[in-house]
From Swiss-Prot:
One of its GO terms (cellular component) is cytosolic small ribosomal subunit. SUPFAM superfamilies: Prokaryotic type KH domain (KH-domain type II), Ribosomal protein S3 C-terminal domain. The gene is rpsC. Keywords: Ribonucleoprotein, Ribosomal protein, RNA-binding, rRNA-binding. Binds the lower part of the 30S subunit head. Binds mRNA in the 70S ribosome, positioning it for translation. The keyword RNA-binding applies. Pfam families: KH_2 (PF07650), Ribosomal_S3_C (PF00189). Residues 39-107 form the KH type-2 domain. Signal peptide: none annotated. Part of the 30S ribosomal subunit. Forms a tight complex with proteins S10 and S14. The keyword ATP-binding does not apply. This is Small ribosomal subunit protein uS3.
Amino acid sequence: MGQKVNPIGLRLGINRNWESRWFPTKASLPENIGEDYKIRAFLKKKLYYAGISQILIERTAKKLRVTVVAARPGIIIGKKGQDVENLKNDVSKLIGKEVNVNIKEERKAQASAQLAAENVAMQLEKRVAFRRAMKKVIQGAQKSGAKGIKISVAGRLGGAEMARTEWYLEGRVPLHTLRAKIDYGVAEAHTTYGNIGIKVWIFKGEVLQKGVQPEKTEDDAPKKTRRPRRGK
């Protein structure tokens, strides 16, 4: 079922950390989940052109810290950091709590699955051919060090009357290997013919714990020599 499940959720606690990091009580759980959803939806909409790849939310007993990882942090920060203060006030008003907002730069933006999906969506909305858009993103990811990338687009591609799914795969994307570090992103392109869904999987290599050796293949295993049978 590795082909069906979200690869990020499948690898939580193995080689992927949670994006919401807090320990709730039974009473506070629904409220915290609702606040996290509101914060992410608000920031994604407001800062769309900054290229947000991840939004981390951390809570302590009295404090709430939001870390925004973006490809273009300068757009968010503004002159002398004034835009960050305004953003902090907007988020605080949204949930009615004091919030601390930090901005981090996404060093390898082309190797981020979420940014890759949004890039394809933006090109499709500008009427770029879907195959050309997919190939351009794949080339960028490979230059950034990705070991494998798969892109899937589904909908009325090229204005066709019947919706279909097309995908490209370069390198290898082992979805069943839990130690494989796989990034996953989803986006939607709103075109005149309807919505087109985009999914991106990026394989960044295998993560092995200290002292754990990679599995040996049949070629690496020592071959057993058979002793000649003695005749009776």
